Curated annotation (Swiss-Prot):
Gene this chain is encoded by: sctE2
The name this protein goes by in its record: SPI-2 type 3 secretion system translocon protein SctE
Places the protein is found: Secreted; Cell surface; Host membrane
Organism field: Salmonella typhimurium (strain LT2 / SGSC1412 / ATCC 700720)
Disruption phenotype: Mutant is severely attenuated in virulence. Disruption prevents SpvB-induced F-actin depolymerization in human macrophages without affecting intra-bacterial SpvB protein levels.
Main location: secreted
Length: 484
Protein backbone atom coordinates (compact mmCIF):
# COMPACT_ATOMS: atom_id res chain seq x y z
CA UNK A 1 0.00 0.00 0.00
CA UNK A 2 1.33 3.43 -0.94
CA UNK A 3 1.97 6.17 1.67
CA UNK A 4 1.92 9.99 1.38
CA UNK A 5 5.42 11.37 2.01
CA UNK A 6 5.60 14.70 3.89
CA UNK A 7 8.45 17.08 4.81
CA UNK A 8 6.83 17.56 8.21
CA UNK A 9 7.18 15.05 11.00
CA UNK A 10 3.59 15.63 12.10
CA UNK A 11 2.30 14.11 8.83
CA UNK A 12 4.27 10.88 9.12
CA UNK A 13 1.22 8.93 10.23
CA UNK A 14 -1.13 10.08 7.50
CA UNK A 15 -2.26 7.38 5.14
CA UNK A 16 -1.66 8.07 1.45
CA UNK A 17 -4.13 7.18 -1.33
CA UNK A 18 -3.17 6.65 -4.90
CA UNK A 19 -4.53 8.99 -7.59
CA UNK A 20 -6.33 6.01 -9.09
CA UNK A 21 -8.27 5.43 -5.85
CA UNK A 22 -9.14 9.13 -5.42
CA UNK A 23 -10.35 9.48 -8.99
CA UNK A 24 -12.84 6.61 -8.56
CA UNK A 25 -14.80 8.53 -5.88
CA UNK A 26 -17.94 10.23 -7.25
CA UNK A 27 -18.37 13.81 -6.12
CA UNK A 28 -21.61 15.80 -5.82
CA UNK A 29 -21.67 19.39 -7.03
CA UNK A 30 -23.49 21.97 -4.96
CA UNK A 31 -25.34 23.36 -8.02
CA UNK A 32 -26.57 20.02 -9.39
CA UNK A 33 -29.14 19.19 -6.65
CA UNK A 34 -27.70 15.73 -6.22
CA UNK A 35 -27.17 14.89 -9.89
CA UNK A 36 -24.22 12.64 -10.58
CA UNK A 37 -21.43 14.60 -12.27
CA UNK A 38 -18.56 13.59 -14.48
CA UNK A 39 -15.33 12.65 -12.87
CA UNK A 40 -12.87 15.50 -12.48
CA UNK A 41 -9.17 15.06 -13.02
CA UNK A 42 -7.34 18.27 -12.19
CA UNK A 43 -3.68 19.10 -12.12
CA UNK A 44 -2.10 21.97 -10.20
CA UNK A 45 1.25 23.04 -11.50
CA UNK A 46 4.15 21.24 -13.13
CA UNK A 47 5.26 19.67 -9.86
CA UNK A 48 1.89 18.16 -9.29
CA UNK A 49 1.94 16.76 -12.79
CA UNK A 50 5.23 15.11 -12.05
CA UNK A 51 3.91 13.66 -8.85
CA UNK A 52 0.88 12.35 -10.64
CA UNK A 53 3.10 10.64 -13.16
CA UNK A 54 5.02 9.02 -10.31
CA UNK A 55 1.74 8.07 -8.51
CA UNK A 56 2.55 10.02 -5.26
CA UNK A 57 1.71 13.54 -3.96
CA UNK A 58 2.80 15.32 -0.82
CA UNK A 59 0.53 16.64 1.94
CA UNK A 60 1.50 20.23 1.10
CA UNK A 61 0.55 19.76 -2.53
CA UNK A 62 -2.79 18.27 -1.53
CA UNK A 63 -3.39 21.22 0.85
CA UNK A 64 -2.55 23.72 -1.91
CA UNK A 65 -4.91 21.97 -4.32
CA UNK A 66 -7.70 22.07 -1.71
CA UNK A 67 -7.02 25.75 -1.05
CA UNK A 68 -7.31 26.57 -4.76
CA UNK A 69 -10.61 24.70 -4.94
CA UNK A 70 -12.03 26.51 -1.91
CA UNK A 71 -10.82 29.90 -3.16
CA UNK A 72 -12.84 29.32 -6.35
CA UNK A 73 -16.05 29.00 -4.30
CA UNK A 74 -17.78 32.45 -4.14
CA UNK A 75 -18.75 34.01 -0.81
CA UNK A 76 -17.13 34.78 2.50
CA UNK A 77 -16.80 31.45 4.29
CA UNK A 78 -14.30 29.49 6.34
CA UNK A 79 -11.73 27.39 4.51
CA UNK A 80 -11.13 24.15 6.37
CA UNK A 81 -7.73 22.52 6.06
CA UNK A 82 -7.01 19.15 4.52
CA UNK A 83 -6.70 17.38 7.90
CA UNK A 84 -10.20 18.69 8.76
CA UNK A 85 -11.52 17.15 5.57
CA UNK A 86 -9.68 13.90 6.26
CA UNK A 87 -11.21 13.77 9.74
CA UNK A 88 -14.77 14.40 8.43
CA UNK A 89 -16.96 11.33 8.14
CA UNK A 90 -18.09 11.14 4.49
CA UNK A 91 -21.26 9.31 5.54
CA UNK A 92 -22.24 12.24 7.78
CA UNK A 93 -21.40 14.65 4.96
CA UNK A 94 -23.60 12.68 2.58
CA UNK A 95 -26.43 12.66 5.08
CA UNK A 96 -26.08 16.41 5.57
CA UNK A 97 -26.09 16.88 1.81
CA UNK A 98 -29.20 14.70 1.55
CA UNK A 99 -30.94 16.71 4.29
CA UNK A 100 -30.02 19.98 2.57
CA UNK A 101 -31.31 18.77 -0.79
CA UNK A 102 -34.54 17.49 0.73
CA UNK A 103 -34.97 20.79 2.59
CA UNK A 104 -34.51 22.75 -0.64
CA UNK A 105 -36.96 20.55 -2.47
CA UNK A 106 -39.44 20.81 0.41
CA UNK A 107 -39.26 24.61 0.43
CA UNK A 108 -39.78 24.71 -3.31
CA UNK A 109 -42.72 22.32 -3.03
CA UNK A 110 -44.24 24.44 -0.25
CA UNK A 111 -43.85 27.58 -2.37
CA UNK A 112 -45.53 25.89 -5.33
CA UNK A 113 -48.34 24.65 -3.09
CA UNK A 114 -48.88 28.18 -1.80
CA UNK A 115 -49.01 29.45 -5.38
CA UNK A 116 -51.57 26.77 -6.23
CA UNK A 117 -53.60 27.72 -3.17
CA UNK A 118 -53.58 31.40 -4.13
CA UNK A 119 -54.55 30.51 -7.70
CA UNK A 120 -57.44 28.46 -6.34
CA UNK A 121 -58.55 31.37 -4.15
CA UNK A 122 -58.41 33.69 -7.17
CA UNK A 123 -60.46 31.21 -9.17
CA UNK A 124 -63.05 30.96 -6.40
CA UNK A 125 -63.31 34.74 -6.15
CA UNK A 126 -63.64 35.08 -9.92
CA UNK A 127 -66.19 32.29 -10.01
CA UNK A 128 -68.28 33.95 -7.30
CA UNK A 129 -68.12 37.25 -9.15
CA UNK A 130 -69.05 35.51 -12.38
CA UNK A 131 -72.05 33.85 -10.74
CA UNK A 132 -73.16 37.22 -9.38
CA UNK A 133 -72.87 38.83 -12.80
CA UNK A 134 -74.75 35.91 -14.36
CA UNK A 135 -77.53 36.52 -11.85
CA UNK A 136 -77.55 40.23 -12.71
CA UNK A 137 -77.68 39.40 -16.40
CA UNK A 138 -80.61 37.04 -15.85
CA UNK A 139 -82.39 39.69 -13.78
CA UNK A 140 -81.86 42.29 -16.50
CA UNK A 141 -83.21 39.88 -19.10
CA UNK A 142 -86.27 39.28 -16.91
CA UNK A 143 -86.82 43.03 -16.59
CA UNK A 144 -86.49 43.43 -20.34
CA UNK A 145 -89.00 40.65 -20.94
CA UNK A 146 -91.38 42.22 -18.43
CA UNK A 147 -91.18 45.61 -20.13
CA UNK A 148 -91.73 44.00 -23.52
CA UNK A 149 -94.75 42.17 -22.10
CA UNK A 150 -96.19 45.42 -20.76
CA UNK A 151 -95.63 47.06 -24.13
CA UNK A 152 -97.44 44.16 -25.76
CA UNK A 153 -100.36 44.61 -23.36
CA UNK A 154 -100.69 48.30 -24.24
CA UNK A 155 -100.39 47.51 -27.94
CA UNK A 156 -103.13 44.91 -27.69
CA UNK A 157 -105.39 47.35 -25.83
CA UNK A 158 -104.88 50.02 -28.50
CA UNK A 159 -105.56 47.49 -31.26
CA UNK A 160 -108.78 46.41 -29.52
CA UNK A 161 -109.95 50.02 -29.25
CA UNK A 162 -109.11 50.85 -32.86
CA UNK A 163 -110.71 47.67 -34.19
CA UNK A 164 -113.94 48.20 -32.25
CA UNK A 165 -114.28 51.83 -33.33
CA UNK A 166 -113.57 51.01 -36.97
CA UNK A 167 -116.19 48.27 -36.89
CA UNK A 168 -118.83 50.51 -35.28
CA UNK A 169 -118.15 53.44 -37.59
CA UNK A 170 -118.14 51.14 -40.61
CA UNK A 171 -121.55 49.81 -39.61
CA UNK A 172 -122.88 53.35 -39.21
CA UNK A 173 -121.55 54.30 -42.64
CA UNK A 174 -123.22 51.24 -44.18
CA UNK A 175 -126.56 52.18 -42.59
CA UNK A 176 -126.18 55.80 -43.64
CA UNK A 177 -125.25 54.84 -47.18
CA UNK A 178 -128.21 52.48 -47.38
CA UNK A 179 -130.66 55.11 -46.14
CA UNK A 180 -129.27 57.79 -48.44
CA UNK A 181 -128.87 55.45 -51.39
CA UNK A 182 -125.13 56.16 -51.62
CA UNK A 183 -123.26 53.00 -52.73
CA UNK A 184 -119.85 54.60 -52.24
CA UNK A 185 -120.73 55.33 -48.63
CA UNK A 186 -121.83 51.73 -48.13
CA UNK A 187 -118.62 50.40 -49.72
CA UNK A 188 -116.54 52.66 -47.48
CA UNK A 189 -118.44 51.38 -44.45
CA UNK A 190 -117.83 47.76 -45.45
CA UNK A 191 -114.11 48.51 -45.84
CA UNK A 192 -114.01 50.08 -42.38
CA UNK A 193 -115.84 47.09 -40.91
CA UNK A 194 -113.37 44.70 -42.54
CA UNK A 195 -110.45 46.76 -41.20
CA UNK A 196 -112.01 46.75 -37.73
CA UNK A 197 -112.57 42.99 -37.78
CA UNK A 198 -108.97 42.42 -38.90
CA UNK A 199 -107.79 44.73 -36.12
CA UNK A 200 -109.78 42.79 -33.52
CA UNK A 201 -108.38 39.48 -34.80
CA UNK A 202 -104.89 40.98 -34.54
CA UNK A 203 -105.59 42.18 -31.00
CA UNK A 204 -106.93 38.73 -30.12
CA UNK A 205 -103.76 37.08 -31.42
CA UNK A 206 -101.64 39.51 -29.38
CA UNK A 207 -103.70 38.76 -26.29
CA UNK A 208 -103.41 35.01 -26.86
CA UNK A 209 -99.65 35.29 -27.30
CA UNK A 210 -99.35 37.13 -23.98
CA UNK A 211 -101.45 34.40 -22.34
CA UNK A 212 -98.98 31.71 -23.41
CA UNK A 213 -100.19 30.62 -26.85
CA UNK A 214 -97.75 29.45 -29.52
CA UNK A 215 -95.60 32.45 -30.42
CA UNK A 216 -94.94 31.54 -34.06
CA UNK A 217 -98.60 30.88 -34.85
CA UNK A 218 -99.78 34.08 -33.16
CA UNK A 219 -97.06 36.11 -34.86
CA UNK A 220 -98.07 34.73 -38.26
CA UNK A 221 -101.70 35.70 -37.57
CA UNK A 222 -100.62 39.17 -36.45
CA UNK A 223 -98.57 39.71 -39.61
CA UNK A 224 -101.40 38.62 -41.92
CA UNK A 225 -104.12 40.60 -40.12
CA UNK A 226 -101.92 43.70 -40.02
CA UNK A 227 -101.61 43.61 -43.79
CA UNK A 228 -105.36 43.01 -44.20
CA UNK A 229 -106.20 45.86 -41.84
CA UNK A 230 -103.86 48.24 -43.64
CA UNK A 231 -105.30 47.23 -47.03
CA UNK A 232 -108.91 47.73 -45.90
CA UNK A 233 -108.08 51.10 -44.37
CA UNK A 234 -106.41 52.12 -47.63
CA UNK A 235 -109.53 51.08 -49.59
CA UNK A 236 -111.78 52.99 -47.17
CA UNK A 237 -109.57 56.05 -47.45
CA UNK A 238 -109.63 55.83 -51.25
CA UNK A 239 -113.45 55.63 -51.19
CA UNK A 240 -113.61 58.63 -48.88
CA UNK A 241 -111.35 60.58 -51.22
CA UNK A 242 -113.54 59.50 -54.16
CA UNK A 243 -116.64 60.71 -52.36
CA UNK A 244 -114.97 64.01 -51.57
CA UNK A 245 -114.06 64.45 -55.24
CA UNK A 246 -117.52 63.51 -56.43
CA UNK A 247 -119.17 65.77 -53.88
CA UNK A 248 -116.86 68.62 -54.81
CA UNK A 249 -117.87 68.23 -58.44
CA UNK A 250 -121.51 68.29 -57.37
CA UNK A 251 -121.08 71.34 -55.14
CA UNK A 252 -119.43 73.46 -57.79
CA UNK A 253 -122.95 74.52 -58.67
CA UNK A 254 -123.30 76.04 -55.20
CA UNK A 255 -120.68 78.65 -55.96
CA UNK A 256 -122.37 79.22 -59.30
CA UNK A 257 -125.72 79.65 -57.58
CA UNK A 258 -124.23 82.22 -55.19
CA UNK A 259 -122.67 84.13 -58.08
CA UNK A 260 -125.96 83.98 -59.97
CA UNK A 261 -127.85 85.44 -57.01
CA UNK A 262 -125.33 88.26 -56.63
CA UNK A 263 -125.53 89.08 -60.33
CA UNK A 264 -129.33 88.93 -60.49
CA UNK A 265 -129.97 92.22 -58.75
CA UNK A 266 -129.36 91.20 -55.16
CA UNK A 267 -125.92 92.78 -55.34
CA UNK A 268 -127.31 96.22 -56.20
CA UNK A 269 -129.84 95.86 -53.41
CA UNK A 270 -127.06 95.06 -50.94
CA UNK A 271 -125.08 98.13 -52.10
CA UNK A 272 -128.10 100.37 -51.60
CA UNK A 273 -129.08 98.96 -48.20
CA UNK A 274 -125.54 98.85 -46.76
CA UNK A 275 -125.38 102.65 -46.62
CA UNK A 276 -125.70 103.27 -42.88
CA UNK A 277 -126.81 99.67 -42.26
CA UNK A 278 -126.69 98.19 -38.77
CA UNK A 279 -126.52 94.67 -37.41
CA UNK A 280 -130.21 94.01 -37.99
CA UNK A 281 -129.92 95.09 -41.62
CA UNK A 282 -126.86 92.88 -42.12
CA UNK A 283 -128.69 89.90 -40.56
CA UNK A 284 -131.68 90.44 -42.82
CA UNK A 285 -129.55 90.69 -45.97
CA UNK A 286 -127.58 87.55 -45.05
CA UNK A 287 -130.83 85.66 -44.36
CA UNK A 288 -132.28 86.68 -47.72
CA UNK A 289 -129.07 85.76 -49.53
CA UNK A 290 -129.05 82.32 -47.93
CA UNK A 291 -132.65 81.63 -48.93
CA UNK A 292 -132.11 82.65 -52.55
CA UNK A 293 -128.87 80.64 -52.87
CA UNK A 294 -130.51 77.54 -51.34
CA UNK A 295 -133.48 77.84 -53.68
CA UNK A 296 -131.27 78.31 -56.72
CA UNK A 297 -129.00 75.38 -55.77
CA UNK A 298 -131.87 72.99 -55.05
CA UNK A 299 -133.33 73.57 -58.50
CA UNK A 300 -130.28 71.79 -59.96
CA UNK A 301 -131.39 68.55 -58.24
CA UNK A 302 -135.08 68.65 -59.10
CA UNK A 303 -136.36 65.71 -61.19
CA UNK A 304 -136.80 66.42 -64.85
CA UNK A 305 -140.33 65.06 -64.76
CA UNK A 306 -142.97 65.77 -62.15
CA UNK A 307 -146.18 63.84 -61.79
CA UNK A 308 -149.51 65.59 -62.03
CA UNK A 309 -151.57 65.53 -58.86
CA UNK A 310 -155.12 66.29 -57.84
CA UNK A 311 -155.90 69.42 -55.91
CA UNK A 312 -156.38 67.53 -52.67
CA UNK A 313 -153.02 65.81 -53.17
CA UNK A 314 -151.01 68.88 -54.06
CA UNK A 315 -149.61 69.36 -50.55
CA UNK A 316 -148.59 65.73 -50.21
CA UNK A 317 -147.03 65.72 -53.68
CA UNK A 318 -145.11 68.92 -52.91
CA UNK A 319 -143.72 67.40 -49.73
CA UNK A 320 -142.70 64.24 -51.59
CA UNK A 321 -141.09 66.33 -54.28
CA UNK A 322 -139.16 68.31 -51.68
CA UNK A 323 -137.95 65.08 -50.04
CA UNK A 324 -136.74 63.75 -53.39
CA UNK A 325 -134.83 66.96 -54.01
CA UNK A 326 -133.26 66.71 -50.55
CA UNK A 327 -132.25 63.09 -51.18
CA UNK A 328 -130.71 63.98 -54.52
CA UNK A 329 -128.77 66.81 -52.91
CA UNK A 330 -127.41 64.70 -50.06
CA UNK A 331 -126.69 61.70 -52.26
CA UNK A 332 -124.74 63.78 -54.79
CA UNK A 333 -123.10 66.39 -52.58
CA UNK A 334 -123.21 65.14 -49.01
CA UNK A 335 -125.34 65.05 -45.91
CA UNK A 336 -124.55 68.68 -45.05
CA UNK A 337 -125.93 69.95 -48.35
CA UNK A 338 -129.63 70.01 -47.57
CA UNK A 339 -131.73 73.10 -48.20
CA UNK A 340 -131.27 74.25 -44.64
CA UNK A 341 -127.59 73.37 -44.71
CA UNK A 342 -126.96 75.31 -47.91
CA UNK A 343 -128.99 78.22 -46.57
CA UNK A 344 -126.91 78.29 -43.38
CA UNK A 345 -123.62 78.17 -45.30
CA UNK A 346 -124.67 80.97 -47.67
CA UNK A 347 -125.98 83.06 -44.78
CA UNK A 348 -122.76 82.71 -42.79
CA UNK A 349 -120.62 83.49 -45.84
CA UNK A 350 -122.61 86.64 -46.66
CA UNK A 351 -122.72 87.79 -43.04
CA UNK A 352 -118.95 87.43 -42.60
CA UNK A 353 -118.33 89.32 -45.85
CA UNK A 354 -120.71 92.14 -44.88
CA UNK A 355 -119.23 92.51 -41.39
CA UNK A 356 -115.72 92.60 -42.79
CA UNK A 357 -116.67 95.28 -45.32
CA UNK A 358 -118.19 97.35 -42.52
CA UNK A 359 -115.05 96.97 -40.40
CA UNK A 360 -112.80 98.04 -43.27
CA UNK A 361 -114.94 101.16 -43.90
CA UNK A 362 -114.82 103.26 -47.03
CA UNK A 363 -117.09 102.96 -50.01
CA UNK A 364 -118.95 99.66 -50.31
CA UNK A 365 -117.97 98.01 -53.58
CA UNK A 366 -120.04 95.21 -55.09
CA UNK A 367 -117.06 93.51 -56.74
CA UNK A 368 -115.13 93.38 -53.49
CA UNK A 369 -118.17 92.05 -51.63
CA UNK A 370 -118.78 89.47 -54.34
CA UNK A 371 -115.22 88.13 -54.13
CA UNK A 372 -115.40 87.88 -50.34
CA UNK A 373 -118.70 86.01 -50.42
CA UNK A 374 -117.53 83.51 -53.05
CA UNK A 375 -114.28 82.90 -51.16
CA UNK A 376 -116.17 82.29 -47.92
CA UNK A 377 -118.55 79.93 -49.73
CA UNK A 378 -115.59 77.96 -51.10
CA UNK A 379 -114.08 77.50 -47.63
CA UNK A 380 -117.37 76.41 -46.11
CA UNK A 381 -118.01 73.96 -48.95
CA UNK A 382 -114.60 72.29 -48.44
CA UNK A 383 -115.10 72.15 -44.69
CA UNK A 384 -118.53 70.57 -45.10
CA UNK A 385 -117.19 68.01 -47.59
CA UNK A 386 -114.36 66.96 -45.26
CA UNK A 387 -116.77 66.78 -42.35
CA UNK A 388 -119.23 64.64 -44.28
CA UNK A 389 -116.67 62.22 -45.72
CA UNK A 390 -114.63 61.71 -42.57
CA UNK A 391 -115.30 60.80 -38.97
CA UNK A 392 -113.59 62.97 -36.42
CA UNK A 393 -114.18 60.40 -33.71
CA UNK A 394 -112.42 57.70 -35.69
CA UNK A 395 -109.56 60.01 -36.58
CA UNK A 396 -109.23 61.08 -32.96
CA UNK A 397 -109.22 57.47 -31.77
CA UNK A 398 -106.65 56.56 -34.39
CA UNK A 399 -104.40 59.47 -33.52
CA UNK A 400 -104.75 58.86 -29.78
CA UNK A 401 -104.11 55.13 -29.95
CA UNK A 402 -101.30 55.46 -32.46
CA UNK A 403 -99.66 58.26 -30.48
CA UNK A 404 -99.97 56.39 -27.20
CA UNK A 405 -98.65 53.22 -28.83
CA UNK A 406 -95.68 55.07 -30.30
CA UNK A 407 -94.93 56.76 -26.97
CA UNK A 408 -95.14 53.47 -25.13
CA UNK A 409 -92.98 51.75 -27.75
CA UNK A 410 -90.43 54.56 -27.58
CA UNK A 411 -90.21 54.39 -23.80
CA UNK A 412 -89.90 50.61 -23.88
CA UNK A 413 -87.22 50.80 -26.58
CA UNK A 414 -85.30 53.35 -24.50
CA UNK A 415 -85.40 51.13 -21.42
CA UNK A 416 -84.62 48.11 -23.57
CA UNK A 417 -81.56 49.86 -25.01
CA UNK A 418 -80.31 50.68 -21.50
CA UNK A 419 -80.83 47.09 -20.35
CA UNK A 420 -79.16 45.70 -23.48
CA UNK A 421 -76.19 48.00 -22.89
CA UNK A 422 -75.94 46.76 -19.30
CA UNK A 423 -76.16 43.16 -20.50
CA UNK A 424 -73.41 43.80 -23.06
CA UNK A 425 -71.21 45.23 -20.31
CA UNK A 426 -71.88 42.18 -18.14
CA UNK A 427 -71.08 39.87 -21.06
CA UNK A 428 -67.81 41.75 -21.67
CA UNK A 429 -66.89 41.48 -17.99
CA UNK A 430 -67.73 37.77 -18.04
CA UNK A 431 -65.50 37.22 -21.03
CA UNK A 432 -62.69 39.05 -19.25
CA UNK A 433 -63.25 36.94 -16.14
CA UNK A 434 -63.28 33.80 -18.28
CA UNK A 435 -59.96 34.87 -19.77
CA UNK A 436 -58.46 35.47 -16.31
CA UNK A 437 -59.79 32.14 -15.05
CA UNK A 438 -58.34 30.37 -18.08
CA UNK A 439 -54.96 32.02 -17.50
CA UNK A 440 -55.13 31.08 -13.82
CA UNK A 441 -56.02 27.50 -14.71
CA UNK A 442 -53.11 27.33 -17.15
CA UNK A 443 -50.78 28.72 -14.49
CA UNK A 444 -52.05 26.11 -12.03
CA UNK A 445 -51.33 23.36 -14.53
CA UNK A 446 -47.82 24.74 -15.04
CA UNK A 447 -47.22 24.91 -11.28
CA UNK A 448 -48.57 21.39 -10.83
CA UNK A 449 -46.26 20.16 -13.55
CA UNK A 450 -43.33 21.92 -11.89
CA UNK A 451 -44.33 20.39 -8.57
CA UNK A 452 -44.40 16.91 -10.11
CA UNK A 453 -41.01 17.51 -11.69
CA UNK A 454 -39.75 18.78 -8.35
CA UNK A 455 -40.85 15.61 -6.56
CA UNK A 456 -39.31 13.51 -9.30
CA UNK A 457 -36.08 15.50 -9.02
CA UNK A 458 -36.14 15.14 -5.25
CA UNK A 459 -36.45 11.37 -5.58
CA UNK A 460 -33.68 11.26 -8.16
CA UNK A 461 -31.43 13.39 -5.94
CA UNK A 462 -32.13 11.13 -3.00
CA UNK A 463 -31.27 8.08 -5.08
CA UNK A 464 -28.04 9.73 -6.25
CA UNK A 465 -27.07 10.54 -2.67
CA UNK A 466 -27.77 6.95 -1.63
CA UNK A 467 -25.71 5.74 -4.58
CA UNK A 468 -22.92 8.06 -3.49
CA UNK A 469 -23.06 6.67 0.03
CA UNK A 470 -22.99 3.14 -1.36
CA UNK A 471 -20.01 3.97 -3.54
CA UNK A 472 -18.26 5.59 -0.60
CA UNK A 473 -18.90 2.51 1.49
CA UNK A 474 -17.42 0.37 -1.28
CA UNK A 475 -14.36 2.62 -1.40
CA UNK A 476 -14.01 2.44 2.38
CA UNK A 477 -14.24 -1.31 2.22
CA UNK A 478 -11.58 -1.44 -0.47
CA UNK A 479 -9.36 0.92 1.53
CA UNK A 480 -9.79 -1.26 4.57
CA UNK A 481 -8.87 -4.24 2.44
CA UNK A 482 -5.72 -2.53 1.20
CA UNK A 483 -4.72 -1.58 4.74
CA UNK A 484 -5.17 -5.07 5.90
Amino acid sequence: MNRIHSNSDSAAGVTALTHHHLSNVSCVSSGSLGKRQHRVNSTFGDGNAACLLSGKISLQEASNALKQLLDAVPGNHKRPSLPDFLQTNPAVLSMMMTSLILNVFGNNAQSLCQQLERATEVQNALRNKQVKEYQEQIQKAIEQEDKARKAGIFGAIFDWITGIFETVIGALKVVEGFLSGNPAEMASGVAYMAAGCAGMVKAGAETAMMCGADHDTCQAIIDVTSKIQFGCEAVALALDVFQIGRAFMATRGLSGAAAKVLDSGFGEEVVERMVGAGEAEIEELAEKFGEEVSESFSKQFEPLEREMAMANEMAEEAAEFSRNVENNMTRSAGKSFTKEGVKAMAKEAAKEALEKCVQEGGKFLLKKFRNKVLFNMFKKILYALLRDCSFKGLQAIRCATEGASQMNTGMVNTEKAKIEKKIEQLITQQRFLDFIMQQTENQKKIEQKRLEELYKGSGAALRDVLDTIDHYSSVQARIAGYRA
